[in-house]
Amino acid sequence: MTFKNLFHPDKVYLLDVLHGLTNLPPQYANVIIFDPPYNIGKDFGNNFDNLDFTDYLEWADKWIKQGIRVLNDSGTMYIYGFSEILAHIFVRINLPKRWLVWHYTNKNSPKNFFWQRSHESIIAVWKDTDKRIFNLDAVREPYTDVFLKNAAGKERAATPGRFSHGNKKTIYTAHENGALPRDVIKVSALAGGAGRVERFFYCDTCENIFMLENRGDHKEHKIIEHPTQKPTELTKKLLLASKPSEGGKVVVPFAGTGSELYIAKKLGMEAIGFEINEDYYCMSNLLIQKGFPNGKI
């Protein structure tokens, strides 16, 4: 059976990550987003979030190896995780890479009387720096008020060094599309009020998805909630940074809610995902087909 007959875009397949990836051809994907279990004991309906740490790293090596094979030379692979876990994975990847930080301030654990976690990390991996796609203007950020007030348009004194322009005076300029993107991405987590717009659930009884505001309509039903749904704003930024000018292919090996595939589809990209949890498999495909129930995303 050929690849074209095996997989069709904009769909999640009920397959293990390794089984799915090994059936994709080399150089297939422009973007791969890995959002694996972090090995911290969360309930994903399987045991892959509670492995011996050595076993976890060896398992990660396998799907990362397949991800590298599937990634094309101009593509980027993103891997989510907590810093203390990703640090071990980072040093095992022998390719160009960059450490990104997803910073949020709206999530805490009141019972944890210690340093509150306010970030997760993302490793960006690519094969060839000369060929890698990075759409700078698509991910520029707003300038700070301080820069716009005190520096933009003003004269910069001549100083020795690599930015001295021949030891001449220059002008601070503000790019019309915003500042250069930073490696700290500030996006609210889907907690509290920030989660109301896009956190959604799967009703196994109704075989449909619904938003948080409609949870009261399903009181006696079997409700499935994914514990690590990522914000669509964050996903959109990663995809916009790395997508080709036209089309492009995305692979999401741990599909979860399917939100990454949904955003990829909205951006005109073809997306394929894999998921071994049957509830999440149903949940993700419904999202891709129907979109968010509130129609706001």
Can you name each region flagged by the protein language model?
Residues 279-297:
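Cysteine-dependent PTP/DSP-like catalytic domain, specifically the C-terminal lobe
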Residues 1-273, 277-283:
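Core catalytic lobe of class I
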